[in-house]
């Protein structure tokens, strides 16, 4: 490294909102750079910059203006162009707020309205008029459940990776608690089958779909292990499974939607549990080593 070292202090940038693509409020970069412009010194945090401001002591300009008062038309255009997904969700909030306050609630004497049932009414009529086809699709669906269960179990028993198994345990336990807590009525047009899972056409919890959540957990693990083709097959089968469940009235749309979210959520929680366990194990080993060094 060259002996010639220069210290560069960037000035305080005053831009109201970090989402506008420019510098954030109150970020001062105080670093030391060598001749090749490589940083070799520390970077001050935003909180340190706030503490180092030397105005009138009461906050001054820092608190005199709210963030929105510094927004410009350029900022609004930038957000609309580069952050269109949050803008789309904002429009969705406004739209469904209007919908929620203008629609009448479904009477207690009526069956719940389900948009998925409306979309699959043609499939429902076909399956209702063809019990053999319904039985074949139910058997294929049960095979898919067996495939995902086998895969999730093998990730732990064969490959020694417990994350997917832990996620499935979390997911089915939570599903049992929620399903028992709120026992939704079975749809009147339900088309059962003796080979469907749960086998024997027994009673089952509707909220949420364990079929869909289990397939999501298996698919996420496949993608994590870069088994992308197998994951794509599972995703396609999961979509077909969801359509079949709606067509047979085996689940409401909300059960399937939450099943997708539950698979993602519990896979993430299982990953955090693994990280926490590894961190605890490392800390335990370090404490044991330090104890041994003190004894010796």
Curated annotation (Swiss-Prot):
Membrane topology field: Multi-pass membrane protein
Keyword Lipid metabolism in annotation: yes
Source taxon at top rank: Eukaryota
One GO-annotated biological process of the protein: phosphatidylcholine metabolic process
Pfam family, one: AtPDCT1_2
Family matches, as PANTHER family: PHOSPHATIDYLCHOLINE:DIACYLGLYCEROL CHOLINEPHOSPHOTRANSFERASE 1-RELATED (PTHR34674:SF1)
Stated name of the protein: Phosphatidylcholine:diacylglycerol cholinephosphotransferase 2
Source species of the chain: Arabidopsis thaliana
């Amino acid at each position: 490294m060259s002996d010639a070292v220069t210290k560069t202090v960037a000035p305080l940038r005053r831009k109201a909102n970090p989402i506008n693509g420019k510098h954030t409020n109150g970020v001062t970069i105080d670093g030391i750079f060598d001749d090749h412009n490589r940083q070799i010194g520390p970077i001050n945090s935003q909180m340190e910059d706030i503490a180092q401001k030397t105005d009138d002591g009461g906050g001054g300009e820092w608190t005199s203006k709210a963030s929105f008062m510094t927004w410009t038309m350029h900022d609004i255009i930038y957000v609309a162009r580069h952050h269109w997904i949050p803008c789309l969700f904002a429009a969705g909030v406004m739209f469904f707020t209007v919908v929620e306050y203008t629609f009448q609630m479904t009477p207690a004497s009526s069956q719940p309205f389900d948009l998925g049932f409306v979309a699959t009414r043609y499939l429902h009529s076909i399956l209702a008029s063809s019990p053999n086809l319904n039985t074949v699709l139910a058997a294929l669906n049960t095979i898919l459940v067996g495939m995902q269960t086998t895969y999730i179990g093998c990730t732990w028993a064969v490959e020694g990776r417990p994350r997917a198994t832990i996620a499935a345990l979390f997911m089915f336990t939570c599903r049992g608690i929620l399903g028992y807590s709120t026992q939704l009525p079975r749809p009147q047009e339900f088309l059962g089958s003796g080979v469907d899972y749960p086998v024997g056409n027994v009673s089952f919890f509707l909220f949420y779909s364990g079929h869909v959540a289990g397939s999501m957990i298996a698919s996420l693990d496949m993608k994590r292990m870069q088994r992308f083709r197998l994951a794509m097959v599972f995703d396609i089968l999961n979509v077909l499974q969801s359509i079949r469940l709606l067509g047979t009235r085996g689940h409401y749309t909300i059960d399937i939607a939450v099943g997708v979210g539950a698979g993602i959520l519990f896979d993430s929680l299982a990953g955090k549990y693994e990280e926490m366990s590894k961190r605890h194990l490392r800390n335990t080993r370090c404490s044991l080593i330090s104890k041994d060094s003190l004894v010796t």
